[in-house]
């Protein structure tokens, strides 16, 4: 075992459940994520916020080990496991689930087939019955092609598909994008329930007020750098901070 792994294992009881430390990511020569560090406690929701182009999605993709952007320096840990040493499929097996902004519903497959496909490789997480209990609309449309669902229903399917894996960290990129307020409220209630079951979540959302009301803590990025880390309530109460970095 390496000195790095020994050190981490020895301090595991004190280490945060999730942490990224001084991560630097690039799209080819473009320096996107510039030395970002933060941690998330188990069962916590963290809102990752900032203006357009701040590096939010790039940070999520770096955590998920998508390879684009490429992590060139820094460490990422989840429950004692070094994500920074993993490829994307290894990070998924380790418990990372990314729900991208475009949801990536697979054409030609039904709702149920989209979920079943995610469970082909172990370890698996929530059962179909549990997912349908969480999202009754999916149960009603289980035999319908996934890409024919409404935007809100596709978002439910994308989240349900992620939960069907043995998930430890849920990464959500713009989950409220294009959704009616009533559907946003439904998704919020779902995320609150998932949190009550111990799920750790990082949410990137342009609707900063909605994300802050949901989250326990917040991180704000500006041009790829971290400019704030603290309680979500403090951001809601700090007009100057909101105006300067979130334009709200």
Model-derived features: positions:
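Glycine-rich phosphate-binding loops of nucleotide-dependent enzymes
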Residues: 2-248
């Amino acid at each position: 075992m390496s000195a790095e792994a020994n050190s981490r294992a020895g301090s595991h009881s004190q280490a945060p459940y999730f942490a990224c430390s001084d991560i630097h990511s690039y799209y080819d020569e473009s320096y996107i994520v510039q030395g970002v560090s933060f941690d998330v406690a188990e069962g916590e929701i963290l809102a990752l916020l900032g203006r357009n182009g701040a590096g939010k999605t790039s940070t999520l993709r770096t955590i998920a080990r998508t390879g684009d952007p490429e992590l060139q320096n820094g460490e990422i840990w989840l429950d004692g496991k070094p994500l920074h040493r993993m490829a994307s499929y290894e990070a998924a097996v380790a418990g990372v689930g990314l729900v991208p902004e475009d949801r990536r519903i697979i054409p030609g497959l039904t709702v149920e087939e989209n979920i079943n496909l995610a469970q082909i490789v172990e370890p698996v997480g929530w059962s179909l019955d549990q997912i349908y209990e969480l999202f009754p609309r999916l149960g009603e449309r289980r035999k319908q092609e996934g890409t024919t669902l409404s935007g809100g229903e596709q978002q439910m399917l994308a989240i349900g598909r992620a939960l069907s894996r043995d998930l430890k960290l849920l990464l959500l990129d713009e989950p409220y994008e294009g959704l009616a307020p009533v559907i946003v409220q439904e998704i919020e209630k779902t995320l609150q329930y998932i949190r009550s079951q111990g799920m750790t979540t990082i949410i990137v959302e342009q609707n900063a007020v909605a994300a802050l009301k949901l989250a326990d803590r917040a991180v704000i990025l500006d041009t790829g750098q971290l400019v704030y880390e603290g309680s979500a309530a403090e951001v809601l109460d700090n007009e100057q901070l909101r105006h300067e970095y979130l334009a709200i």
